């Protein structure tokens, strides 16, 4: 009987500790995912932007420029 009580208390304790730590680890994973997403957006190849007169079909124009549609369907970065 004593062994059964000890086992039940142990299982309850372990279950409670897992539930408590699961809440904290979920937040860390969420923040880690956000950090990784931001790193992927800011890697060197993603920061490349089109200068004036360059095409803007596959990459965005640099700040201060906008993509103007051309006659051939593609656009170029213009002020």
UniProtKB/Swiss-Prot annotation:
Function (record text): Ion channel inhibitor that inhibits the increase in intracellular calcium upon depolarization in DRG neurons. In vivo, both intraperitoneal and intracranial injections into mice induce hyperactivity.
Free-text comment about domains: The presence of a 'disulfide through disulfide knot' structurally defines this protein as a knottin. The cysteine framework is VI/VII (C-C-CC-C-C).
Disulfide topology: 49-62, 56-67, 61-77
Summary of the tissues where the protein is detected: Expressed by the venom duct.
Keyword Disulfide bond carried by entry: yes
UniProt KW keywords: Disulfide bond, Hydroxylation, Ion channel impairing toxin, Knottin, Secreted, Signal, Toxin
Pfam short name (any one): Conotoxin
Protein name as it appears in the record: Conotoxin Vi6.4
GO cellular component terms listed in the entry, alphabetical order: extracellular region
One Gene Ontology term of the molecular function aspect: toxin activity
Highest taxon listed in the record's lineage: Eukaryota
Signal peptide region: 1-22
Membrane spanning residue stretches: none
Major place of residence: secreted
Organism encoding this protein: Conus virgo (Virgin cone)
Record-listed 4-hydroxyproline modification sites: 60, 63
Subcellular location: Secreted
Entry keyword RNA-binding: no
Lineage: Eukaryota, Metazoa, Spiralia, Lophotrochozoa, Mollusca
Propeptide: 23-47
Family that this chain belongs to: Belongs to the conotoxin O1 superfamily.
InterPro entries: Conotoxin (IPR004214)
């Amino acid at each position: 009987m004593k062994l059964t009580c000890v086992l039940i208390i142990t299982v309850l304790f372990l279950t409670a500790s897992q539930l408590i730590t699961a809440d904290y680890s979920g937040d860390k994973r969420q923040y880690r995912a956000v950090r990784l997403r931001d790193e992927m957006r800011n890697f060197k190849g993603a920061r490349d932007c089109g200068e004036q007169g360059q095409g803007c079909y596959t990459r965005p124009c640099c700040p201060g420029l906008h993509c103007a549609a051309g006659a051939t369907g593609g656009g170029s970065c213009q002020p």
